[in-house]
Amino acid sequence: MQLEDARAVRRNDRRDRTMTDERKIPVLRVTPAEAKRALLVLAGVVAWWCASWLAIGPSMEPRGPVFAVYVLLFVATFAGHYVARFPPLPPLFGQLVAGFVMRNVPGLSEAVGEAVDARCSSAMRTAALGVILVRAGLSLDVAAVYRLRWPAARLAFGPSTAEALAVALLAKPALNLPWTHCAVLGYLFAAISPAVVIPSLLRLQDKGYGVKAGVPALVTTAASVDVVYAIAGFGVCAGFLVTAAGGGASSAAWRAPTQIVGGALLGYLAGRALGAITPPDRKVSPSVGSPDAFRAWEVPGETPARRAAWLLGMSLLILFAGAEAEMTGGAALGVIVASAAAAREWGALDAKACGGVLNVLWNDFAQPLLFALIGAAVDVSRLSGDEVGAGVGLLAAGLCVRGLVAFLAAGGGQLAFTERIFVAIAWMPKATVQAALAGLPLDAAIAYEGGDKNGPETKRAEVILALGVLAILITAPLGAAAVAVSGERLLKKAEASDEESNEQ
Protein backbone atom coordinates (compact mmCIF):
# COMPACT_ATOMS: atom_id res chain seq x y z
CA MET A 1 0.00 0.00 0.00
CA GLN A 2 2.77 2.39 0.90
CA LEU A 3 4.60 1.47 -2.33
CA GLU A 4 1.51 2.29 -4.41
CA ASP A 5 1.12 5.60 -2.57
CA ALA A 6 4.76 6.45 -3.27
CA ARG A 7 4.32 5.63 -6.96
CA ALA A 8 1.19 7.78 -7.08
CA VAL A 9 3.04 10.67 -5.48
CA ARG A 10 5.88 10.36 -8.03
CA ARG A 11 3.36 10.26 -10.91
CA ASN A 12 1.67 13.38 -9.58
CA ASP A 13 5.04 15.12 -9.21
CA ARG A 14 5.98 14.27 -12.79
CA ARG A 15 2.60 15.51 -14.00
CA ASP A 16 2.94 18.77 -12.05
CA ARG A 17 6.45 19.31 -13.40
CA THR A 18 5.22 18.68 -16.94
CA MET A 19 2.36 21.15 -16.49
CA THR A 20 4.73 23.71 -15.02
CA ASP A 21 7.16 23.28 -17.91
CA GLU A 22 4.30 23.68 -20.37
CA ARG A 23 3.25 26.88 -18.65
CA LYS A 24 6.82 28.14 -18.72
CA ILE A 25 7.21 27.40 -22.46
CA PRO A 26 3.75 28.12 -23.89
CA VAL A 27 5.14 28.71 -27.37
CA LEU A 28 5.65 24.97 -27.86
CA ARG A 29 1.91 24.44 -27.62
CA VAL A 30 -0.22 26.07 -30.35
CA THR A 31 -3.91 25.31 -30.10
CA PRO A 32 -6.03 24.82 -33.23
CA ALA A 33 -7.91 28.02 -32.37
CA GLU A 34 -4.65 29.98 -32.27
CA ALA A 35 -3.49 28.49 -35.56
CA LYS A 36 -6.82 29.32 -37.20
CA ARG A 37 -6.68 32.87 -35.90
CA ALA A 38 -3.11 33.29 -37.15
CA LEU A 39 -4.09 32.11 -40.63
CA LEU A 40 -7.05 34.51 -40.69
CA VAL A 41 -4.84 37.40 -39.64
CA LEU A 42 -2.26 36.50 -42.30
CA ALA A 43 -4.98 36.30 -44.95
CA GLY A 44 -6.27 39.71 -43.88
CA VAL A 45 -2.80 41.22 -44.04
CA VAL A 46 -2.23 39.84 -47.55
CA ALA A 47 -5.66 41.08 -48.66
CA TRP A 48 -4.97 44.58 -47.33
CA TRP A 49 -1.59 44.60 -49.05
CA CYS A 50 -3.08 43.54 -52.38
CA ALA A 51 -5.79 46.21 -52.15
CA SER A 52 -3.25 48.87 -51.20
CA TRP A 53 -0.90 47.81 -53.99
CA LEU A 54 -3.68 48.08 -56.56
CA ALA A 55 -4.63 51.51 -55.20
CA ILE A 56 -1.19 53.03 -54.55
CA GLY A 57 1.13 51.19 -56.89
CA PRO A 58 4.94 51.26 -56.55
CA SER A 59 4.89 52.64 -52.99
CA MET A 60 3.45 49.31 -51.80
CA GLU A 61 6.05 47.22 -53.61
CA PRO A 62 9.21 45.97 -51.84
CA ARG A 63 11.65 48.84 -51.24
CA GLY A 64 8.68 51.21 -51.27
CA PRO A 65 8.18 53.53 -48.26
CA VAL A 66 4.57 52.57 -47.59
CA PHE A 67 5.38 48.87 -47.96
CA ALA A 68 8.21 49.26 -45.43
CA VAL A 69 5.93 50.82 -42.81
CA TYR A 70 3.24 48.20 -43.49
CA VAL A 71 5.67 45.31 -43.02
CA LEU A 72 7.20 46.88 -39.91
CA LEU A 73 3.79 47.28 -38.30
CA PHE A 74 2.76 43.69 -39.06
CA VAL A 75 6.04 42.10 -37.98
CA ALA A 76 6.23 44.21 -34.82
CA THR A 77 2.66 43.31 -33.87
CA PHE A 78 3.40 39.61 -34.33
CA ALA A 79 6.66 39.89 -32.36
CA GLY A 80 4.87 41.69 -29.54
CA HIS A 81 2.23 38.96 -29.25
CA TYR A 82 4.95 36.31 -29.36
CA VAL A 83 7.00 37.89 -26.55
CA ALA A 84 3.85 38.43 -24.48
CA ARG A 85 3.64 34.63 -24.11
CA PHE A 86 6.65 34.85 -21.79
CA PRO A 87 5.53 37.06 -18.91
CA PRO A 88 6.81 39.27 -17.44
CA LEU A 89 8.63 40.21 -20.67
CA PRO A 90 6.86 43.25 -22.16
CA PRO A 91 5.60 43.08 -25.76
CA LEU A 92 7.53 46.23 -26.62
CA PHE A 93 10.78 44.26 -26.33
CA GLY A 94 9.80 42.02 -29.23
CA GLN A 95 8.58 45.00 -31.24
CA LEU A 96 11.88 46.82 -30.80
CA VAL A 97 13.91 43.75 -31.76
CA ALA A 98 11.72 43.25 -34.84
CA GLY A 99 12.49 46.75 -36.11
CA PHE A 100 16.18 46.34 -35.30
CA VAL A 101 16.35 43.07 -37.26
CA MET A 102 14.54 44.58 -40.23
CA ARG A 103 17.20 47.30 -40.47
CA ASN A 104 20.38 45.31 -39.85
CA VAL A 105 19.84 41.90 -41.52
CA PRO A 106 21.00 41.80 -45.17
CA GLY A 107 18.11 41.37 -47.57
CA LEU A 108 15.53 42.61 -45.11
CA SER A 109 17.43 45.86 -44.72
CA GLU A 110 17.26 46.74 -48.42
CA ALA A 111 13.61 45.75 -48.79
CA VAL A 112 12.23 47.22 -45.55
CA GLY A 113 14.61 48.89 -43.10
CA GLU A 114 16.30 51.34 -45.45
CA ALA A 115 13.11 52.02 -47.40
CA VAL A 116 11.41 53.89 -44.55
CA ASP A 117 11.18 57.56 -45.42
CA ALA A 118 12.97 59.64 -42.74
CA ARG A 119 10.42 62.45 -42.77
CA CYS A 120 7.50 60.03 -42.59
CA SER A 121 9.17 58.10 -39.76
CA SER A 122 9.72 61.32 -37.81
CA ALA A 123 6.08 62.33 -38.19
CA MET A 124 4.79 58.93 -37.09
CA ARG A 125 7.10 58.85 -34.07
CA THR A 126 5.90 62.33 -33.10
CA ALA A 127 2.30 61.13 -33.37
CA ALA A 128 3.11 58.16 -31.13
CA LEU A 129 4.76 60.56 -28.68
CA GLY A 130 1.48 62.49 -28.65
CA VAL A 131 -0.40 59.36 -27.62
CA ILE A 132 2.12 58.76 -24.81
CA LEU A 133 1.85 62.32 -23.52
CA VAL A 134 -1.95 62.37 -23.61
CA ARG A 135 -2.13 59.09 -21.71
CA ALA A 136 0.36 60.43 -19.17
CA GLY A 137 -1.73 63.55 -18.64
CA LEU A 138 -5.00 61.65 -18.31
CA SER A 139 -3.49 59.21 -15.80
CA LEU A 140 -1.99 61.98 -13.67
CA ASP A 141 -4.04 61.70 -10.49
CA VAL A 142 -3.73 65.17 -8.96
CA ALA A 143 -5.42 64.07 -5.72
CA ALA A 144 -3.03 61.12 -5.30
CA VAL A 145 -0.05 63.33 -6.08
CA TYR A 146 -1.15 65.78 -3.40
CA ARG A 147 -1.80 63.02 -0.87
CA LEU A 148 1.62 61.44 -1.46
CA ARG A 149 3.31 64.71 -2.35
CA TRP A 150 6.47 64.41 -0.25
CA PRO A 151 7.45 60.76 -0.83
CA ALA A 152 6.28 60.93 -4.45
CA ALA A 153 8.26 64.14 -5.05
CA ARG A 154 11.41 62.64 -3.56
CA LEU A 155 11.04 59.51 -5.66
CA ALA A 156 10.10 61.34 -8.86
CA PHE A 157 12.74 64.07 -8.87
CA GLY A 158 15.65 62.69 -6.84
CA PRO A 159 16.68 59.53 -8.77
CA SER A 160 16.06 61.06 -12.21
CA THR A 161 18.07 64.18 -11.43
CA ALA A 162 20.93 62.15 -9.96
CA GLU A 163 21.05 59.78 -12.93
CA ALA A 164 20.87 62.63 -15.46
CA LEU A 165 23.76 64.43 -13.76
CA ALA A 166 25.86 61.26 -13.44
CA VAL A 167 25.37 60.25 -17.07
CA ALA A 168 26.01 63.79 -18.33
CA LEU A 169 29.24 64.14 -16.34
CA LEU A 170 30.55 60.73 -17.39
CA ALA A 171 29.48 61.02 -21.05
CA LYS A 172 31.81 63.96 -21.64
CA PRO A 173 35.07 61.98 -21.24
CA ALA A 174 33.58 58.64 -22.36
CA LEU A 175 32.03 59.75 -25.66
CA ASN A 176 33.67 63.15 -26.22
CA LEU A 177 30.30 64.81 -26.78
CA PRO A 178 29.51 68.49 -26.23
CA TRP A 179 27.91 69.33 -22.89
CA THR A 180 24.55 69.97 -24.53
CA HIS A 181 24.49 66.45 -25.98
CA CYS A 182 25.60 65.02 -22.63
CA ALA A 183 22.68 66.72 -20.89
CA VAL A 184 20.24 65.39 -23.49
CA LEU A 185 21.62 61.86 -23.05
CA GLY A 186 21.33 62.19 -19.28
CA TYR A 187 17.65 63.09 -19.36
CA LEU A 188 17.02 60.47 -22.05
CA PHE A 189 18.27 57.81 -19.63
CA ALA A 190 16.46 59.37 -16.66
CA ALA A 191 12.84 58.45 -17.34
CA ILE A 192 11.21 55.34 -15.92
CA SER A 193 8.94 53.21 -18.12
CA PRO A 194 5.43 52.79 -16.66
CA ALA A 195 4.63 50.40 -19.53
CA VAL A 196 7.18 47.94 -18.08
CA VAL A 197 6.78 48.54 -14.35
CA ILE A 198 3.03 48.99 -13.89
CA PRO A 199 1.86 45.61 -15.35
CA SER A 200 4.25 43.66 -13.10
CA LEU A 201 3.26 45.85 -10.17
CA LEU A 202 -0.44 45.21 -10.76
CA ARG A 203 0.14 41.46 -10.85
CA LEU A 204 1.86 41.70 -7.46
CA GLN A 205 -0.94 43.89 -6.14
CA ASP A 206 -3.56 41.34 -7.19
CA LYS A 207 -1.69 38.77 -5.09
CA GLY A 208 -1.63 41.13 -2.10
CA TYR A 209 2.09 42.01 -2.14
CA GLY A 210 2.96 45.49 -0.93
CA VAL A 211 -0.67 46.55 -0.59
CA LYS A 212 -0.59 47.23 3.15
CA ALA A 213 2.46 49.52 2.87
CA GLY A 214 1.05 51.30 -0.18
CA VAL A 215 3.95 50.42 -2.48
CA PRO A 216 1.84 50.13 -5.69
CA ALA A 217 0.16 53.49 -5.07
CA LEU A 218 3.47 55.22 -4.33
CA VAL A 219 5.29 53.80 -7.36
CA THR A 220 2.38 54.49 -9.73
CA THR A 221 1.99 58.09 -8.55
CA ALA A 222 5.70 58.87 -8.56
CA ALA A 223 6.17 57.22 -11.97
CA SER A 224 3.62 59.53 -13.60
CA VAL A 225 5.39 62.60 -12.19
CA ASP A 226 8.81 61.17 -13.13
CA VAL A 227 7.75 60.80 -16.77
CA VAL A 228 6.53 64.40 -16.92
CA TYR A 229 9.75 65.69 -15.35
CA ALA A 230 12.06 63.66 -17.61
CA ILE A 231 10.21 64.66 -20.79
CA ALA A 232 10.29 68.33 -19.83
CA GLY A 233 13.99 68.18 -18.94
CA PHE A 234 14.85 66.37 -22.16
CA GLY A 235 12.88 68.82 -24.26
CA VAL A 236 14.49 71.87 -22.69
CA CYS A 237 18.00 70.43 -23.12
CA ALA A 238 17.26 69.32 -26.68
CA GLY A 239 16.33 72.89 -27.52
CA PHE A 240 19.98 73.84 -27.04
CA LEU A 241 21.43 71.25 -29.46
CA VAL A 242 21.13 72.77 -32.90
CA THR A 243 21.01 76.35 -31.61
CA ALA A 244 24.29 75.88 -29.77
CA ALA A 245 25.82 74.19 -32.81
CA GLY A 246 24.92 77.24 -34.88
CA GLY A 247 26.61 79.59 -32.45
CA GLY A 248 23.44 80.80 -30.75
CA ALA A 249 23.79 79.24 -27.32
CA SER A 250 23.12 82.57 -25.63
CA SER A 251 19.91 83.03 -27.59
CA ALA A 252 18.85 79.51 -26.61
CA ALA A 253 19.21 80.27 -22.90
CA TRP A 254 16.01 82.28 -22.78
CA ARG A 255 14.09 79.41 -24.38
CA ALA A 256 14.19 77.24 -21.23
CA PRO A 257 11.97 79.39 -18.98
CA THR A 258 9.88 80.43 -21.98
CA GLN A 259 9.20 76.81 -22.91
CA ILE A 260 8.28 75.78 -19.37
CA VAL A 261 6.02 78.74 -18.57
CA GLY A 262 4.58 79.14 -22.05
CA GLY A 263 3.98 75.44 -22.57
CA ALA A 264 2.27 74.97 -19.21
CA LEU A 265 0.08 78.07 -19.67
CA LEU A 266 -0.89 77.20 -23.24
CA GLY A 267 -1.66 73.62 -22.25
CA TYR A 268 -3.79 74.67 -19.29
CA LEU A 269 -5.87 77.08 -21.37
CA ALA A 270 -6.26 74.57 -24.21
CA GLY A 271 -7.29 71.80 -21.81
CA ARG A 272 -9.86 73.95 -20.04
CA ALA A 273 -11.28 75.08 -23.37
CA LEU A 274 -11.47 71.52 -24.66
CA GLY A 275 -13.18 70.38 -21.46
CA ALA A 276 -15.75 73.16 -21.84
CA ILE A 277 -16.68 72.34 -25.45
CA THR A 278 -16.80 68.56 -24.88
CA PRO A 279 -18.97 68.27 -21.76
CA PRO A 280 -19.93 64.92 -20.23
CA ASP A 281 -23.47 63.57 -20.10
CA ARG A 282 -25.57 65.46 -17.59
CA LYS A 283 -29.10 65.33 -16.22
CA VAL A 284 -31.29 68.42 -16.52
CA SER A 285 -34.47 68.99 -14.52
CA PRO A 286 -37.25 70.95 -16.28
CA SER A 287 -38.62 74.10 -14.75
CA VAL A 288 -41.47 73.89 -12.28
CA GLY A 289 -44.88 74.05 -13.95
CA SER A 290 -43.87 72.42 -17.21
CA PRO A 291 -45.55 69.17 -18.32
CA ASP A 292 -42.34 67.26 -17.60
CA ALA A 293 -41.74 68.88 -14.21
CA PHE A 294 -41.39 65.53 -12.44
CA ARG A 295 -39.16 63.91 -15.03
CA ALA A 296 -35.48 64.64 -15.57
CA TRP A 297 -33.81 63.74 -18.83
CA GLU A 298 -30.22 63.36 -19.94
CA VAL A 299 -28.51 65.83 -22.21
CA PRO A 300 -25.96 63.74 -24.13
CA GLY A 301 -22.38 64.93 -24.16
CA GLU A 302 -19.39 63.81 -26.15
CA THR A 303 -18.59 60.10 -26.34
CA PRO A 304 -15.19 58.86 -25.07
CA ALA A 305 -14.05 58.20 -28.64
CA ARG A 306 -14.88 61.73 -29.76
CA ARG A 307 -13.21 63.21 -26.69
CA ALA A 308 -10.10 61.14 -27.42
CA ALA A 309 -10.12 62.33 -31.04
CA TRP A 310 -10.46 65.97 -29.97
CA LEU A 311 -7.72 65.69 -27.37
CA LEU A 312 -5.32 63.78 -29.59
CA GLY A 313 -5.85 66.15 -32.51
CA MET A 314 -5.20 69.19 -30.33
CA SER A 315 -2.12 67.52 -28.86
CA LEU A 316 -0.65 66.72 -32.27
CA LEU A 317 -1.23 70.32 -33.32
CA ILE A 318 0.70 71.53 -30.27
CA LEU A 319 3.54 69.05 -30.85
CA PHE A 320 4.05 69.77 -34.55
CA ALA A 321 3.75 73.53 -33.99
CA GLY A 322 6.29 73.27 -31.17
CA ALA A 323 8.66 71.37 -33.44
CA GLU A 324 8.42 74.09 -36.08
CA ALA A 325 9.12 76.74 -33.43
CA GLU A 326 12.03 74.67 -32.03
CA MET A 327 10.27 74.42 -28.66
CA THR A 328 9.75 70.68 -28.39
CA GLY A 329 10.07 70.60 -24.60
CA GLY A 330 7.45 73.27 -24.04
CA ALA A 331 5.09 71.58 -26.49
CA ALA A 332 5.45 68.22 -24.73
CA LEU A 333 4.80 69.81 -21.35
CA GLY A 334 1.82 71.66 -22.82
CA VAL A 335 0.25 68.42 -24.06
CA ILE A 336 0.57 66.81 -20.63
CA VAL A 337 -0.91 69.85 -18.86
CA ALA A 338 -3.72 70.10 -21.44
CA SER A 339 -4.66 66.45 -20.95
CA ALA A 340 -4.65 66.80 -17.16
CA ALA A 341 -6.76 69.98 -17.35
CA ALA A 342 -9.27 68.37 -19.71
CA ALA A 343 -9.48 65.31 -17.46
CA ARG A 344 -10.29 67.52 -14.49
CA GLU A 345 -13.09 69.20 -16.48
CA TRP A 346 -14.57 65.86 -17.51
CA GLY A 347 -14.32 64.10 -14.18
CA ALA A 348 -12.60 60.86 -13.20
CA LEU A 349 -15.02 58.43 -14.88
CA ASP A 350 -15.15 60.22 -18.23
CA ALA A 351 -11.39 60.76 -18.25
CA LYS A 352 -10.88 57.05 -17.56
CA ALA A 353 -13.20 56.16 -20.44
CA CYS A 354 -11.27 58.49 -22.76
CA GLY A 355 -8.03 56.91 -21.56
CA GLY A 356 -9.45 53.48 -22.38
CA VAL A 357 -9.93 54.50 -26.01
CA LEU A 358 -6.36 55.77 -26.19
CA ASN A 359 -5.08 52.57 -24.55
CA VAL A 360 -6.59 50.54 -27.39
CA LEU A 361 -5.01 52.88 -29.94
CA TRP A 362 -1.66 52.61 -28.16
CA ASN A 363 -1.59 48.84 -27.70
CA ASP A 364 -2.86 47.89 -31.16
CA PHE A 365 -1.22 50.51 -33.35
CA ALA A 366 0.97 53.25 -31.86
CA GLN A 367 3.19 51.09 -29.64
CA PRO A 368 4.21 48.45 -32.23
CA LEU A 369 4.74 51.14 -34.86
CA LEU A 370 6.82 53.37 -32.55
CA PHE A 371 9.14 50.62 -31.32
CA ALA A 372 9.52 49.13 -34.79
CA LEU A 373 10.44 52.51 -36.26
CA ILE A 374 12.90 53.35 -33.50
CA GLY A 375 14.52 49.92 -33.86
CA ALA A 376 14.72 50.34 -37.63
CA ALA A 377 16.40 53.73 -37.20
CA VAL A 378 19.52 52.15 -35.66
CA ASP A 379 22.21 51.22 -38.18
CA VAL A 380 24.90 49.20 -36.41
CA SER A 381 27.32 49.69 -39.31
CA ARG A 382 27.60 53.37 -38.34
CA LEU A 383 28.50 52.60 -34.72
CA SER A 384 31.85 51.66 -33.26
CA GLY A 385 32.47 49.08 -30.57
CA ASP A 386 33.98 51.75 -28.34
CA GLU A 387 30.77 53.79 -28.45
CA VAL A 388 28.63 50.77 -27.59
CA GLY A 389 30.95 49.78 -24.75
CA ALA A 390 30.97 53.32 -23.39
CA GLY A 391 27.18 53.36 -23.62
CA VAL A 392 26.87 50.17 -21.58
CA GLY A 393 29.22 51.62 -18.98
CA LEU A 394 27.23 54.86 -18.80
CA LEU A 395 24.00 52.93 -18.44
CA ALA A 396 25.40 50.78 -15.64
CA ALA A 397 26.80 53.79 -13.78
CA GLY A 398 23.56 55.69 -14.14
CA LEU A 399 21.51 52.75 -12.87
CA CYS A 400 23.76 52.37 -9.82
CA VAL A 401 23.35 56.04 -8.93
CA ARG A 402 19.64 55.91 -9.65
CA GLY A 403 19.09 52.81 -7.53
CA LEU A 404 20.98 54.24 -4.57
CA VAL A 405 19.11 57.55 -4.65
CA ALA A 406 15.76 55.76 -5.11
CA PHE A 407 16.50 53.61 -2.05
CA LEU A 408 17.27 56.74 -0.01
CA ALA A 409 14.27 58.64 -1.39
CA ALA A 410 11.91 55.82 -0.37
CA GLY A 411 13.01 56.20 3.25
CA GLY A 412 11.54 58.43 5.90
CA GLY A 413 8.15 56.78 5.72
CA GLN A 414 6.39 53.53 6.48
CA LEU A 415 8.33 51.37 4.00
CA ALA A 416 10.52 48.62 5.41
CA PHE A 417 14.12 48.01 4.35
CA THR A 418 13.23 45.27 1.85
CA GLU A 419 10.37 47.33 0.42
CA ARG A 420 12.78 50.21 -0.23
CA ILE A 421 15.04 47.79 -2.10
CA PHE A 422 12.08 46.76 -4.25
CA VAL A 423 11.27 50.40 -5.03
CA ALA A 424 14.88 50.90 -6.15
CA ILE A 425 14.60 47.85 -8.45
CA ALA A 426 11.26 49.02 -9.84
CA TRP A 427 12.86 52.36 -10.69
CA MET A 428 15.27 50.80 -13.21
CA PRO A 429 13.40 49.82 -16.44
CA LYS A 430 13.43 52.15 -19.44
CA ALA A 431 11.39 51.80 -22.60
CA THR A 432 8.48 53.96 -23.72
CA VAL A 433 9.87 57.44 -23.11
CA GLN A 434 13.27 56.49 -24.52
CA ALA A 435 11.65 55.13 -27.70
CA ALA A 436 9.60 58.29 -28.15
CA LEU A 437 12.41 60.77 -27.47
CA ALA A 438 15.59 59.08 -28.74
CA GLY A 439 14.96 59.98 -32.37
CA LEU A 440 14.15 63.67 -31.83
CA PRO A 441 17.79 64.88 -31.79
CA LEU A 442 18.44 62.95 -35.02
CA ASP A 443 15.42 64.53 -36.71
CA ALA A 444 16.60 68.00 -35.69
CA ALA A 445 20.17 67.29 -36.82
CA ILE A 446 19.10 65.99 -40.24
CA ALA A 447 16.94 69.07 -40.77
CA TYR A 448 19.74 71.37 -39.61
CA GLU A 449 22.41 69.80 -41.83
CA GLY A 450 20.20 69.42 -44.89
CA GLY A 451 20.07 65.63 -44.83
CA ASP A 452 23.84 65.13 -44.70
CA LYS A 453 24.23 61.79 -42.93
CA ASN A 454 27.95 62.38 -42.40
CA GLY A 455 27.56 65.74 -40.69
CA PRO A 456 28.91 66.09 -37.13
CA GLU A 457 25.52 66.84 -35.57
CA THR A 458 23.94 63.86 -37.32
CA LYS A 459 26.67 61.51 -36.11
CA ARG A 460 26.30 62.71 -32.53
CA ALA A 461 22.53 62.33 -32.72
CA GLU A 462 22.94 58.78 -34.06
CA VAL A 463 25.02 57.93 -30.99
CA ILE A 464 22.25 59.27 -28.72
CA LEU A 465 19.64 57.27 -30.64
CA ALA A 466 21.67 54.05 -30.49
CA LEU A 467 22.29 54.40 -26.75
CA GLY A 468 18.60 55.03 -26.15
CA VAL A 469 17.73 51.80 -27.96
CA LEU A 470 20.50 49.99 -26.07
CA ALA A 471 19.01 51.16 -22.78
CA ILE A 472 15.65 49.68 -23.77
CA LEU A 473 17.12 46.37 -24.92
CA ILE A 474 18.99 45.91 -21.64
CA THR A 475 16.69 47.34 -18.97
CA ALA A 476 13.20 46.51 -20.29
CA PRO A 477 13.40 42.68 -20.12
CA LEU A 478 15.77 42.56 -17.16
CA GLY A 479 13.81 45.19 -15.25
CA ALA A 480 10.46 43.50 -15.84
CA ALA A 481 11.86 40.14 -14.73
CA ALA A 482 13.55 41.69 -11.68
CA VAL A 483 10.34 43.39 -10.55
CA ALA A 484 8.33 40.20 -10.95
CA VAL A 485 10.88 37.96 -9.20
CA SER A 486 11.88 40.29 -6.38
CA GLY A 487 8.36 41.43 -5.58
CA GLU A 488 7.29 38.19 -3.91
CA ARG A 489 10.54 38.06 -1.95
CA LEU A 490 10.89 41.67 -0.84
CA LEU A 491 7.30 42.81 -0.37
CA LYS A 492 5.06 41.75 2.49
CA LYS A 493 1.91 39.91 1.54
CA ALA A 494 -1.26 41.31 3.04
CA GLU A 495 -3.59 39.02 4.93
CA ALA A 496 -7.13 38.48 3.74
CA SER A 497 -8.51 40.94 6.30
CA ASP A 498 -6.02 43.60 5.18
CA GLU A 499 -6.96 43.16 1.52
CA GLU A 500 -10.67 43.46 2.34
CA SER A 501 -10.09 46.63 4.35
CA ASN A 502 -8.04 48.13 1.49
CA GLU A 503 -10.76 47.30 -1.02
CA GLN A 504 -13.35 48.94 1.19
Predicted regions and their residues:
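Hydrophobic core segments of alpha-helical transmembrane domains in multi-pass membrane transport
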Residues: A43-W53, F74-H81, G99-N104, F234-A238, ...
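Alpha-helical transmembrane bundle and helix-membrane interface signal
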Residues: D141-R147, I198-T221, V225-V261, V284
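Transmembrane alpha-helices that form the ion-translocation and gating core
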Residues: V75-F86, G107-V112, V142-G210, A273-A276, ...
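Non-transmembrane, juxtamembrane loop and terminal tail segments
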Residues: Q2-K24, V288-A293, A494-Q504
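Membrane-interface junctions of multi-pass transporters
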Residues: A55-E61, V83-P90, G99-P151, T278-G393, ...
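Small-residue-rich segments of transmembrane alpha-helices in multi-pass membrane proteins
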Residues: Q95-P106, R154-A168, T221-A232, P304-F320, ...
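Structural signature of hydrophobic alpha-helical transmembrane segments
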Residues: S59-L73, D117-L133, T180-S193, R255-L269, ...
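N-terminal membrane topogenic signal
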Residues: P26-L42, P88-P91, T303-A305
